[in-house]
Curated annotation (Swiss-Prot):
Gene deletion effect: Cells lacking this gene are much more sensitive to the presence of 2-deoxyglucose in the growth medium than wild-type.
Alphabetical list of PANTHER family matching this protein: 6-PHOSPHOGLUCONATE PHOSPHATASE, HEXITOL PHOSPHATASE B
Alphabetically ordered keywords of this record: Carbohydrate metabolism, Cobalt, Hydrolase, Magnesium, Manganese, Metal-binding, Zinc
EC number(s) given by UniProt: 3.1.3.68, 3.1.3.22, 3.1.3.50, 3.1.3.23
Cofactor: Mg(2+); Mn(2+); Co(2+); Zn(2+)
The protein, known as: Hexitol phosphatase B
Species in which this protein is naturally found: Escherichia coli (strain K12)
NCBIfam families (alphabetical): HAD-SF-IA-v3, PRK10826.1
Keyword hit for Magnesium: yes
Functional description taken from the UniProt entry: Sugar-phosphate phosphohydrolase that catalyzes the dephosphorylation of D-mannitol 1-phosphate and D-sorbitol 6-phosphate. Also catalyzes the dephosphorylation of 2-deoxyglucose 6-phosphate (2dGlu6P); this is a biologically important activity in vivo since it contributes to the elimination of this toxic compound and plays an important role in the resistance of E.coli to 2-deoxyglucose. To a lesser extent, is also able to dephosphorylate mannose 6-phosphate (Man6P), erythrose-4-phosphate, 2-deoxyribose-5-phosphate (2dRib5P), ribose-5-phosphate (Rib5P) and glucose-6-phosphate (Glu6P) in vitro.
InterPro entries: Beta-PGM-like, HAD-like_sf, HAD-SF_hydro_IA, HAD_sf, PGP-like_dom2
Amino acid sequence: MSTPRQILAAIFDMDGLLIDSEPLWDRAELDVMASLGVDISRRNELPDTLGLRIDMVVDLWYARQPWNGPSRQEVVERVIARAISLVEETRPLLPGVREAVALCKEQGLLVGLASASPLHMLEKVLTMFDLRDSFDALASAEKLPYSKPHPQVYLDCAAKLGVDPLTCVALEDSVNGMIASKAARMRSIVVPAPEAQNDPRFVLADVKLSSLTELTAKDLLG
């Protein structure tokens, strides 16, 4: 029988897990794409973009419907700026976030954030909700060659926390994020959106919850 792993750190995703920002990213993306003359009704032609870095999403659009004018990087910056302003307007903290972070601290765990969003957005969001001091390390995939589902952002966060990835539990809402955390060899907790709860791919996770309000110490530690 294998020895249970010791969990020393919990690493959270941000978009869709801490804040209900996925609809805001969608809105920002579609607003900007429509302003470029892109036919946004063809969005269903794109693969599953949940959890992907925004430059990867912009590249997918460009491959199908190239536009004239602003560079892809400029378009990425427009989408990010729009998404941040929507987050500031709506302040969409999800239920159970403060309690989940507090539970991790009560269990003596280090707490990290690993996100595809830009570092300045991570800082802004945590500060907005008075959560910055609860996080021991932040890692962004913004400047990495590959973002989720590649594990690098999780490996970077574990390194910043000073722990082995095998001693981490990752909390995610997306399949791409779950794959990234499992590729980093972490314990995996998923909290899918209601419409994704029955996605069979989430069978790869160690624990599946319908809300962070359900999180227990046993879920974290195994």
